[in-house]
């Protein structure tokens, strides 16, 4: 896959223009440039934590192997929720396990993203009529990207990771941290 990112070209809005927000604060396009740079760095260093519950977790392991190579997109596995940006839930989620998923999600620092991988974690899948199965991870925590399939192919998970990277790039990093001009 090729990237259309040109690191040599400055981002849009680099021209020197000054705006006032009416409160006496003058913002320049430097804010936009720093915002672009922060989002570029965050989107290309996504650290994920896997919560594998069933056969979809095997597909994630295959994606992390030499053929899928998640690390070429900047994604690296982390064992702790405190050091991860992305939470990948793969497999059938039961109500008993849902409290642990919520606890792990709450331990992640902002900004945090979630990929629901496979039919079982998206909607309950084959086991959706069982009394103990949660009918989707989105009933417990907010989900950013759904990866369909039973089990999904490694390419589908890579596409989901690219969607997360696009979402990170479109955010406003400076405004979220309370800096001026945001």
Swiss-Prot record:
Location in the cell: Cell inner membrane
Cofactor(s) the record lists:
[4Fe-4S] cluster
Enzyme Commission no:
7.1.1.-
Q: Which family does it belong to?
A: Belongs to the complex I 20 kDa subunit family.
Q: Which GO terms describe its molecular function?
A: 4 iron, 4 sulfur cluster binding; iron ion binding; NADH dehydrogenase (ubiquinone) activity; NADH:ubiquinone reductase (non-electrogenic) activity; quinone binding
Q: Which protein is depicted?
A: NADH-quinone oxidoreductase subunit B 2
Q: What class of enzyme is it?
A: translocase
Sections of the chain in a coiled coil: none
What Pfam families does the annotation carry? Oxidored_q6 (PF01058)
* GO CC, alphabetical: plasma membrane; respiratory chain complex I
Query: What exactly does this protein do?
Result: NDH-1 shuttles electrons from NADH, via FMN and iron-sulfur (Fe-S) centers, to quinones in the respiratory chain. The immediate electron acceptor for the enzyme in this species is believed to be ubiquinone. Couples the redox reaction to proton translocation (for every two electrons transferred, four hydrogen ions are translocated across the cytoplasmic membrane), and thus conserves the redox energy in a proton gradient.
For the keyword Iron, the answer is yes
Classify the protein's membrane topology as the record does: Peripheral membrane protein
Q: What is its main location?
A: membrane
**Signal sequence, renumbered to the chain:** none
State any GO BP term from the record. aerobic respiration
Catalytic activity of the protein: a quinone + NADH + 5 H(+)(in) = a quinol + NAD(+) + 4 H(+)(out)
Annotated binding of [4Fe-4S] cluster, by residue: 55-56, 120, 150
Q: How is the cofactor bound?
A: Binds 1 [4Fe-4S] cluster.
Lineage, top-rank taxon, reads Bacteria
- Keyword annotations: 4Fe-4S, Cell inner membrane, Cell membrane, Iron, Iron-sulfur, Membrane, Metal-binding, NAD, Quinone, Translocase, Transport, Ubiquinone
User: Could you give the subunit structure recorded for this chain?
Assistant: NDH-1 is composed of 14 different subunits. Subunits NuoB, C, D, E, F, and G constitute the peripheral sector of the complex.
């Amino acid at each position: 896959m090729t990237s259309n990112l040109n690191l040599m070209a400055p981002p849009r809005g680099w021209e020197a223009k000054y705006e006032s927000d009416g409160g006496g604060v003058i913002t320049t396009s430097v804010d936009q440039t720093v915002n672009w740079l922060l989002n570029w760095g965050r989107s290309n260093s996504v650290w994920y934590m896997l919560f594998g519950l069933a056969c979809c977790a095997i597909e994630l392991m295959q994606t992390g192997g030499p053929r899928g190579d998640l690390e070429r997109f900047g994604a690296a596995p982390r064992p702790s929720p405190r050091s991860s940006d992305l939470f990948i839930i793969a497999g059938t989620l039961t109500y008993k396990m849902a409290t642990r998923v919520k606890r792990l999600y709450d331990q992640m620092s902002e900004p945090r993203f979630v990929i629901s991988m496979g039919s079982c974690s998206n909607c309950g899948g084959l086991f959706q009529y069982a009394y103990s199965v949660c009918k989707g991870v989105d009933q417990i925590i907010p989900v950013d990207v759904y990866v369909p399939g039973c089990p999904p192919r490694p390419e589908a998970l890579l596409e989901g990771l690219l969607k997360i990277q696009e979402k990170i790039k479109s955010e406003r990093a400076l405004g979220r941290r309370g800096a001026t001009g945001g």
